[in-house]
Amino acid sequence: DEQRAKELFEKGRKLAKDGRCAEALSPFQESLRYAEGVGTLLNLGNCYETLGKTASAHRSFLRAAEVASRNDDKRKDEAKERAKSIEREVSSLLIHVPINLKSSAEIRVDGEIWPKERWDVPWPIDPGVHDIEVIAPPRPKQTESVTVKPHGDKADWAVLTRDPATSPVPPPKSDRPKPDAKETGEESSPQ
């Protein structure tokens, strides 16, 4: 519904103008559900960029350029320029998946499925802490948090190649101190 999209866009724009970009995200995103507008995508990208979410901003600007191009909108060049201007600031996450798990593993990042086309390639992601979960039965679930830094960081993370539960375990260490030579009756000769 175009009217609802416009109302939400105006609400988001007012919040953004008041310096409340975090609050403006929701109305902009909801507006896009009703109608995908170039202005909404550009404003959403501006807010993401202000909040340091460079991968999300880049995606919004690229999408704005696509929509503008499709609709013969003069803002196409602006959207392309905005995307290009932050390209080097976009951080990425590279998740290495061993070949023996490629057919059975499911990977989630921040609770969302990480599709196989993202495996083993650097993928744009916003800076911050990201929770990674690997489910590959019969192995136990592997979970870990990875911090992706801002300003074009390239974070790497690898799925364990072996099941930690079945990996060889070193023998337990004894709590008893080793006996010295006097206790064992073995004296060293003074040679």
Protein language model regions, located:
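Acidic, Pro/Ser/Gly/Ala-rich intrinsically disordered segments
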Residues: 1-191
